[in-house]
């Protein structure tokens, strides 16, 4: 038992089963860089307060830099007996510079605030990485939007043909979803920008420390004002997990449509061979595995969010060992999100838009019906419900003839309320550009939407 850094109170040795069960080193060694960063900031603060001597600080920093180098070069020996990355680094530091100086590093600090600080630094870094990837994905969508303002396709409600739109308008809908994802991450990052370092176990310390200094060194905006909240808070992790879950809600919807649109039934897009796979038995198959995997991984990141919510539910203040389970799911979600956004962006850059197939699909499902109803209201002063009924009859007549309403030669033969001007409406491009409301599918509106998004990402 005397090998453990907390063993002074114990007379008996820990069971080997407990040592293995209690250890988190295999998971939290991911935080080695943040742990060393936090320790250097803490030691620097201790020296500024007269708690450490200058030569002790220099030795600690030099020793920690050696530990970092050993880990990065794969020379560091991880031992599960060290329990976690924090103890592993501290033990190795004491081996390098001696326990007389190495043992002073943990003055005015608990593993509780140390862990919270390391974890929060990782979360902040992850926010910034995800913001960059989302920005790049929006830029790819904008490139498609600029090219395809006149590429007409059907929109859908209930997966039934609805109204004609442009591919530009369609892809911009997803770009605006990602814009909200960015804003959500920015808000979460702002809430996470408070340092718990110096909170100690839960009640602060009797040393005259300077928490603001260590927070400043680590790049935090301020300190957590309550030490008990500082060590027990995991909102920052929940916020990131939620933000990632919403990102996957959006990307899984896009991926589902890419799967549908690349199928033989639609053939709206062609996914590059570089991002498709084949079948082990069917030679003709070209499978959209990237999209299917992202769709599947959505359940995984949802699960990680629910897991941490459940872990934190009803935990008494302040720190509890349950909270050791907070990291694995978050590490997994962050990696999953980064990998997915990178490959989704690469795939979208190379998709081929099949314009003719999209336009031909508009000739099914009577996409111009709403335009006709609006015309009757606007030009003939007919109440909308009556106009709806009249156009419904036009649709029924067209279906009886086995044609789409866009193929009708003379609307007045179906109902005399229609004149020659109404025939001008049976044109998909006219329908697209007849929309006058803000945020509509017209080219003028689409260009404004592109400007909004370009202005947004330029200011990131």
Curated annotation (Swiss-Prot):
One cellular-component annotation, GO: cytosol
The UniProt record lists the keyword Magnesium: no
Pathway connected to this protein: Amino-acid biosynthesis; L-arginine biosynthesis; L-arginine from L-ornithine and carbamoyl phosphate: step 3/3
Alphabetical UniProt keywords: Amino-acid biosynthesis, Arginine biosynthesis, Cytoplasm, Lyase
Catalytic activity: 2-(N(omega)-L-arginino)succinate = fumarate + L-arginine
SUPFAM superfamilies referenced in this protein's UniProt entry, alphabetically: L-aspartase-like (SSF48557)
Record field: transmembrane: none
GO molecular function, one term: argininosuccinate lyase activity
PROSITE patterns: FUMARATE_LYASES
InterPro entries membership: Arg_succ_lyase_C (IPR029419), Argininosuccinate_lyase (IPR009049), Fumarase/histidase_N (IPR024083), Fumarate_lyase_CS (IPR020557), Fumarate_lyase_fam (IPR000362), Fumarate_lyase_N (IPR022761), L-Aspartase-like (IPR008948)
GO biological process: arginine biosynthetic process via ornithine; L-arginine biosynthetic process
UniProt name for this protein: Argininosuccinate lyase
Organism listed in the record: Campylobacter jejuni subsp. jejuni serotype O:6 (strain 81116 / NCTC 11828)
Gene: argH
